[in-house]
Amino acid sequence: MNIIKRGGTEVPFDKSKIVTAILKANAQAKECDKLSNIDEMSEKIASHIADDIEGNLLSTGSVPNVEDVQDMVEEFISKSGKFKLAKSYAIYRYEHELLRKKNTTDDKILSLLNRNNEEINQENANKNPIVNSTQRDYMAGEVSKDLARRYIYPEDLMKAHDAGIIHLHDQDYQANTMTNCCLINMEDMLQNGTVISGTKIDKPKSFDTACNIATQILAQIASNQFGGQTINIYHLVPFVDISRQKIKKSLIKEFESVGIPYDEDKINKITENRLKEEIRHGVQTIQYQILTLMTTNGQTPFCSIFIYLDEAETPSLKKDYAMVIEEILKQRILGVKNQTGIYIAPTFPKILYVLEPDNIEDDGEYYYLTKLAAECSAKRMVPDYMSEKKLKELKEGNVFGTMGCRSLLSVWKDPETGKAKFWGRFNSGVCTINLPDVALSVMDDMLGEHDITEYTERDMSKFENLWSTKQDEIKEKFWKLLDERLKLVYDAQIIRHKRLRGVPSDVAPILWQHGAFARLKPGETIDKLLFDGYSTISLGYVGLYETVKSLTGKSQMDPSVKDFALSIVKHMKDICDSWNKIENIGFSVYGTPEESTTYKFAKSLRKRHGIIKDITDKDYVMNSYHTDVKEKVNAFDKLTNESPFQDFTTGGAISYVEVPNMTKNIEAVLAILKHIYNTTVYAEINCKLDCCQKCGYMGEISLIRDSNNKLIWKCPQCGNTDQNSMNIIRRVCGYMMNANVVNQGRLNEFENRVLHL
């Protein structure tokens, strides 16, 4: 068994250290409070306590951290009847904590530099903490976290964060005045020119050049934000005809210069052939540049490309757009080569493909593109799909992309034109509420059960019986505590908002001065873009499944409690609407992806509320409103059941279905897409895309438990367990990522996923 130290390193568990700590506290206690007046007997009792603690830890199957073990030491000393000794141990622990607080970052930074910080290794599946540039970002992040903890956030918010009641996202960037995610106004930057690193960039004169400039813009913007970015591929489409005319003119000149006769038809055919080659090259530039560029965040840009065919203003633009879309899909189907030369699915850019009558109906002119998209989904797990029909219902007739992964803007109309604007807007950040903790805190109170440890096994039938007899009282207490917890989120987000107020445009010229968001003057503050709903700031939530299960004993999709589940999400939306009116800020409800937060919240729930079947007996919490990963439900019912929750999660959310290998059953994929079009704002199809670099195996690589009961990947063909010599692609939180380096909580969630088809 291993244990995670405070600095994040994972080391073998050594129970002798527990014995030593107990005996040191024992030595400071009065004679009457000691374990025994005889030293040998005290050591024997301390050893028994250490044995009991080790047994409890082994029974959980998870890797504990030092704080968990110290809590258990206090608890077990108290159980032995030595309450004053337990207090002495707490004082001993507190004194050592004060010494550590003199410098809160050294241990973590040193473990990072020594490449043995297990927490950081598993924190972000797209950041390799061994690489120098990534290490520098993590080092800066540790300093930022320290500043956020000691200077930016008040103690009550940090305590709530540490206890897992809320999660203050992206603390590693809070010291900086940076924004989260955005929709880049690429149209303005390409058509009117921009400035990159002090160099003036004029309007491109070809599609190929436009693609190259777009990727340079992306890298610059990603380095000035901490979240994802989305570009609209349609903003590149006008350059297709510019290239067409350029190629045509060049061809005529070539033919004339050598005296070869030509006709219009021949020129047009050659032009279109060369144009397709340029489109292929331009799309390839976007694909490879995004994958190989590294931002100052030490990672590939978290980039999405948005595809909405009906956006084209003319038939000719629509045909050019279709050519670009077709090439994007064909290149993604091909994939990119890994280190051993095997074609695999690239993780970026994410593709957002809008389903509309022209491309989803069998007789639609562009249905062939959706068939290609379905083939791509079956082989490479992209695109993600957005429904024109549902978006227009929820967003006042507008269709636009998510900002990076899932964050979705509200409608904002330019007061000068009266028209809705989306490209060039952004999100300021997220704070997430742990909904299951609200529910379990209420149930603990209702049951009068407060003396709970993380090893207390709870009787779920008590929860169910209480709901059947005291439903109204439970609801009253739940709404009251929920509002108290939401106030914490509100306070945190007001602090975040105020951090951005007064910031000059000079901090990120490409964002604020050169077109990505605005064309502000040097020295002008960004304040006007923080109000009136131009930008958003998010109230995230997780664990609706565990919340409803805790209160009622049923899944949130059970017809008898689904209305109550919906009322929880609606309540959060109503709260955000009220905050908007008070502050004139764009608060929105957001379905939090919780890549690493899922493990943190799961551990905190177990620590605060004990072991409860299907709620805290696992190492993860369900994303937002998602159905339990273990629940057996078909893909169509899952999407239908989850759809109403998206309607209230207006700040962005994703539904997904888990499917087997669908490369031989594209018709079934198309059936799912048609269902998405009719029911769901935003959804994706998950399959298994793995490759063992040692033997070349392509298929699903297995999850097993090693000798420390830790989940690891193992190749079913050659038995390889070297986690660094595999390509394991899973969709974790809306993004595809390298799942061989995610945390144990997320691996536990993978382990429990069932197929929906």
Question: Model-derived features: where do they sit?
Answer:
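Charged, amphipathic alpha-helical regulatory modules used
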Residues: M1-R115, E751-L755
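Conserved catalytic cores of very large enzyme subunits
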Residues: E95-G533, K554, D558-T721, N727-I728
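Contiguous, well-ordered alpha-helical segments that form the cores/surfaces of helical PPI scaffolds
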Residues: I537-S550, K570, R731
